UniProtKB/Swiss-Prot annotation:
<feature type="short sequence motif" description="GyrA-box">
    <location>
        <begin position="528"/>
        <end position="534"/>
    </location>
</feature>
<dbReference type="InterPro" id="IPR013760">
    <property type="entry name" value="Topo_IIA-like_dom_sf"/>
</dbReference>
<keyword id="KW-0413">Isomerase</keyword>
<dbReference type="GO" id="GO:0006261">
    <property type="term" value="P:DNA-templated DNA replication"/>
</dbReference>
<dbReference type="InterPro" id="IPR005743">
    <property type="entry name" value="GyrA"/>
</dbReference>
<feature type="compositionally biased region" description="Acidic residues">
    <location>
        <begin position="845"/>
        <end position="862"/>
    </location>
</feature>
<keyword id="KW-0963">Cytoplasm</keyword>
<dbReference type="GO" id="GO:0034335">
    <property type="term" value="F:DNA negative supercoiling activity"/>
</dbReference>
<comment type="subunit">
    <text>Heterotetramer, composed of two GyrA and two GyrB chains. In the heterotetramer, GyrA contains the active site tyrosine that forms a transient covalent intermediate with DNA, while GyrB binds cofactors and catalyzes ATP hydrolysis.</text>
</comment>
<feature type="active site" description="O-(5'-phospho-DNA)-tyrosine intermediate">
    <location>
        <position position="126"/>
    </location>
</feature>
<dbReference type="InterPro" id="IPR002205">
    <property type="entry name" value="Topo_IIA_dom_A"/>
</dbReference>
<keyword id="KW-0046">Antibiotic resistance</keyword>
<dbReference type="GO" id="GO:0005737">
    <property type="term" value="C:cytoplasm"/>
</dbReference>
<comment type="similarity">
    <text>Belongs to the type II topoisomerase GyrA/ParC subunit family.</text>
</comment>
<dbReference type="GO" id="GO:0006265">
    <property type="term" value="P:DNA topological change"/>
</dbReference>
<keyword id="KW-0799">Topoisomerase</keyword>
<dbReference type="InterPro" id="IPR013758">
    <property type="entry name" value="Topo_IIA_A/C_ab"/>
</dbReference>
Amino acid sequence: MEENIFSSNQDIDAIDVEDSIKASYLDYSMSVIIGRALPDARDGLKPVHRRILYAMNDLGVGSRSPYKKSARIVGDVIGKYHPHGDTAVYDALVRMAQNFSMRVPAVDGQGNFGSVDGDGAAAMRYTEARMTVLAEELLRDLDKDTVDFIPNYDDSLSEPDVLPARVPNLLLNGSSGIAVGMATNIPPHSLDELVNGLLTLLDDKEVGLEDIMTHIKGPDFPTGGIIFGKKGIIEAYKTGRGRIKLRAKTHIEKKPNKDVIVVDELPYQVNKAKLHADIADLVKEKLIDGISEVRDESDRDGIRLVIELKRDAMSEIVLNNLFKSTQMEVTFGVIMLAINNKEPKVFSLLELLKLFLNHRKTVIIRRTIFELQKARARAHILEGLKIALDNIDAVINLIKTSADTNSARDGLMAKFGLSELQSNAILDMRLSKLTGLEREKLEAELKEILELIEKLDAILKSETLIENIIRDELLEIKSKFKCPRITDIVDDYDDIDVEDLIPNENMVVTITHRGYIKRVPSKSYEKQKRGGKGKVAVTTYDDDFIESFFTCMSHDTLMFVTDRGQLYWLKVYKIPEGSRTAKGKAVVNLISLQADEKIKAIIPTTDFDESKSLAFFTKNGIVKRTNLSEFKNIRSIGVKAINLDDNDELVTVVIANSEPDESYDDSFEDGEGVSNLQTISEDNSENSLESGKMLFAVTKKGMCIKFALNKVRQIGRVSRGVTAIRFKENLDEVVGAVVIENDSQEILSVSQKGIGKRTTADEYRLQSRGGKGVICMKLTPKTKDLVGVVMVDEEMDLMALTSSGKMIRVDMQSIRKAGRNTSGVIVVNVDGDEVVSIARCPKEESDDDDIVADDTQEQDME
């Protein structure tokens, strides 16, 4: 039978398990918080780091001493001060030796102490270590009773509760740790800036954060990088908590036909090898486009992660995607939590600076008291020796006649009024001290000691002198370490788009029948006079030809409308830039076109303002108007922009400011009921013009119609539209359309044979939508069919494209003005070729003014 361990008469206290667990967990929490995970606000060290440095100091491995095996150091730390696992202690030692972890390392390691690639250090039996100058500055004056000592874990030894720390180590090297219910993450800083900030605080106790930040600009990470924005820094310095955005530092190297992104500096605590692998994975999974190869060329001179781009990739866009998708951009969460007076607290920057200065003030006071006591003790001895020398004969006689040392000591104390210490010093004095030279040295030393006592006493009585000592020591530290900033701080990029990194230049965008697209700076095409023969705009495949082109800005958004009525988005700068004769890139690689889907219209726009609308014109004379804002949120698969009849296709789309819709007969919505429309008389034309803009459409057979924009009311994206013009000839079709602001504007029309003219808009009478129109250009075999129209603008040039792929730029003002019912003059000398498209482009300086143009006679067709 099992024996009952409790006797019947034994007193047993009942306890609540819940209360016991709470108390035990609280004790454990405080043990972790105070004794393990959080740094002291004064010296910036956790207990393990402090014990490592103290053990190294005991072993005498200073910055000028020989290296000592890491295993020996770890063994001393574990055996004397830190009864935990050797791995944890060695890891802490290793981190203090890594220049990519510490802004200024406290340990000088010899051997493999890890790398920025995440490689672990070699085993402690292979590596060696010693203290750096920084560690010596943290420990300086430790032997002068400057800090309190506490018993070690078994009360056999004592260890410092805090180090004297002549350096603001908490802010210099930062700290990170996870305790129970709390964590700290303090970033490192530049020592030069910290010293300047401390000196400013010494000079003005009431200085504000704004003034301090003129010196301490922000964190300074050992791996460099770029901090974006000061908002997070200010918040962290003000409240002790904040978020700092940190990016890798890169540069672009230009190579023939492609760019190379080179990463020079990494964000703090980013693993380079993992970053390399992550980028490679993103490229493999096609989550980032434009990268052909990633390789690591880092060496002892520094980091060099090379990212080679494809020929048509834009480095700015690829780099922006890398920042978004990888650890080339990270957020450093600041929590300035530290221990003060055995309590954890989140500190502001000013509080930490003041704590350090107060700590240094305490250290200097205790050091001064220690030195004063030592000086007074020495002066006391020297005064006794001086009395003995002044009475040397009597002293010698007394000693000679004394029975023993004790009687001699008592005799000296009684006869000359000396203390026991003084008497012992006299008895211990060598005979050589009786020489005249030694007497002079003694008197000089006494004088020097008395002056030192006076100086030390003055220091203790003057706070100003104490602050001057702190100031001098800080300046000494600054000159000794020379630690300039290596992390750049730039303006925040929250409001900066990738477009801000790309010049907003004039571009010519071309697209071929087979769907190859490219952009070329418009300055690549020199302006020529009328009749110029142009330059080759693109080299096409044998079965391909340029189908359309237009001019726009790099930052514009392109809206692609296809034969299926779908609309897609694409930024102009995302189109690969090519040479004037380059073939371009397949547009299916840029937007998500479906199989056999063909682009029919491309509309550039700078915004999606609700005050604007899109007017769609089809080959069969249908017009539809939809507010531009309907297309501002486009998915990658596109949206439906217009419903087309089976035998119809889109010709062009123009942008116009939205006008209030006028009421009209809904029977026109399907294109019927045209016979009910009445042509607006000339008298009513002006009144109608006052109400808003006009749409102007032209046909292949030289007809045109001008009607009020507000006669086409805005409808939804998936609607069909209404009739714009009825054709006189069966084979006729709409070939172009423009928006007219007022009747004083001029319209430029061009035919297939390069014949063109400028005509004022008031020569085309205003009609109701759905009419048959009037003659726009008199067509002859010499002119052939009409190609299109553009609005004349003195700030713009005309760009004409031929079927052979040639482009020519012509000054619009050089083209003769002619009436509505005329043919015009030669605008482009086609030499058997034909003009297939025209567009406007911004003016450029002409370098080709010697080209002579031929004119044709204007023909009156009225």
